[in-house]
């Protein structure tokens, strides 16, 4: 009787980390970020369309919780990226394309960090930030001016 062997290298080759691909962890963090962004946008649209009341408050808690989760995932993603550099650009790519790619990535990361930060800074208006109703994030000192500026910046983003 011959031992059972299963050939997986050809099927899993596209998923295997290599010098020319992002690691599986980087790919998973990327797609988790995408999923969270896709989830938060309709939540925001529904939340702002609701009349003030308990239902809008529940949506706000969920919206803020998604924002906190996005922030945490992006921080983990950046830490991973710092310890696991991106694969090199395709050979022959024009230098200007590499520069555009790097600038675009930097701006996306900045936006992914600044949106949750400005959202959290809005709590300087005195409202606590609850994470899924499980616990509150540390309360910022009440500062109406900071809350107002954060509100404007968050809405511009």
Q: What is each stretch, according to the model?
A:
Residues 1-157:
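Membrane-embedded alpha-helical bundles that constitute the cytochrome b-like, heme-associated redox core
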């Amino acid at each position: 009787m011959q031992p059972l062997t299963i050939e997986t290298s050809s099927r899993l080759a596209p998923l295997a980390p290599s010098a020319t691909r992002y690691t599986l962890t980087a790919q998973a963090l990327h797609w988790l970020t995408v999923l969270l962004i896709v989830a938060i946008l309709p939540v925001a649209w529904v939340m702002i369309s609701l009349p003030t009341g308990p239902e809008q408050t529940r949506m706000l808690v969920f919206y803020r919780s998604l924002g906190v989760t996005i922030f945490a995932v992006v921080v983990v993603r950046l830490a991973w990226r710092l310890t696991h550099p991106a694969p090199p650009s395709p050979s022959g790519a024009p230098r200007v394309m590499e520069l555009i790619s790097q600038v675009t990535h930097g701006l996306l990361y900045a936006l992914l960090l600044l949106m949750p930060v400005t959202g959290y800074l809005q709590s300087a208006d005195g409202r606590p930030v609850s994470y899924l109703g499980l616990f509150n994030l540390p309360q910022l000192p009440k500062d109406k001016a900071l809350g107002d500026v954060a509100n404007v910046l968050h809405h511009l983003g």
